[in-house]
């Protein structure tokens, strides 16, 4: 960028690699901007716009620096992510958060979220927001349309993935905002809908502080 971006948003990558059948993003090949380029764009926002925060845009931040053709289980590249966020914070911004990330990606490496939280100074007065695609609580639908959204986990583990990811994120001062898809491909049955409702209800009951 050559002029300040809206809300301090800076793109760090394009594409996803998870292959969900309802998403056009999966048609794009994965491409990444280097930490050096990201840092320079944030500095434009600081110097020309006086923006003291960096809103980091990606389609799934947890695949940054990953090659999905060789990383079949979609494990995050923790080193690349730590390098990226270290570069971001070195600009002097007071706050940063990614736009999007998968729930499975947040827990595939148990050290990832705690380490990133330390780098970004996440805490009670500095919460990190992230948008995550829950999409459906239906095991049938998630397996049919988005099985790699759960990688490295299996479709039958979806409810556990959702609950464990919310727990991990919240414990490290990350606040996920969920998206849901109603009537997925005109294939959603009443039972699929109730399965989603049950998952959300269980999440609320089991993690009331989430």
PLM features per residue range, with description:
Residues 1-37:
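Acidic, low-complexity intrinsically disordered segments
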Residues 1-5, 179, 210:
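Short intrinsically disordered, low-complexity coil segments enriched in acidic
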Residues 16, 38, 132, 200:
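Conserved, mostly hydrophobic/aromatic
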Residues 23, 177-180:
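A short small-residue
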Residues 39, 45-46, 201-205:
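An active-site-proximal structural segment forming one wall of the substrate-binding cleft
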Residues 43-175, 182-190:
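Conserved SAM/AdoMet-binding glycine-rich loop
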Residues 194-210:
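Auxiliary Fe-S-binding modules of radical SAM enzymes
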């Amino acid at each position: 960028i050559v002029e300040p971006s809206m809300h301090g948003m800076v793109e760090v990558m394009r594409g996803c690699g998870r292959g969900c059948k309802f998403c056009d993003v999966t048609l794009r090949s994965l491409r990444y901007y280097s930490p050096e380029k990201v840092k320079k764009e944030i500095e434009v926002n600081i110097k020309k716009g006086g923006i003291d925060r960096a809103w980091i845009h990606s389609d799934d931040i947890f695949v940054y620096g990953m090659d999905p053709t060789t990383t079949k289980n979609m494990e995050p590249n923790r080193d690349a992510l730590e390098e990226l966020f270290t570069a971001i914070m070195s600009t002097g911004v007071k706050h940063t958060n990614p736009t999007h990330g998968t729930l499975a990606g947040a827990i595939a490496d148990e050290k990832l979220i705690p380490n990133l939280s330390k780098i970004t100074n996440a805490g009670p007065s500095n919460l990190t927001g992230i948008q995550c695609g829950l999409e459906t609580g239906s095991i049938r639908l998630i397996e049919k349309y988005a099985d790699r959204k759960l990688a490295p986990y299996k479709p039958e583990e979806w409810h556990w993935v959702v609950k464990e990811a919310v727990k991990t994120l919240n414990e490290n001062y990350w606040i996920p905002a969920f998206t849901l898809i109603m009537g997925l491909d005109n294939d959603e049955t009443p039972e699929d809908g109730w399965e989603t409702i049950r998952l959300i209800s269980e999440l609320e009951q089991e993690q009331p502080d989430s």
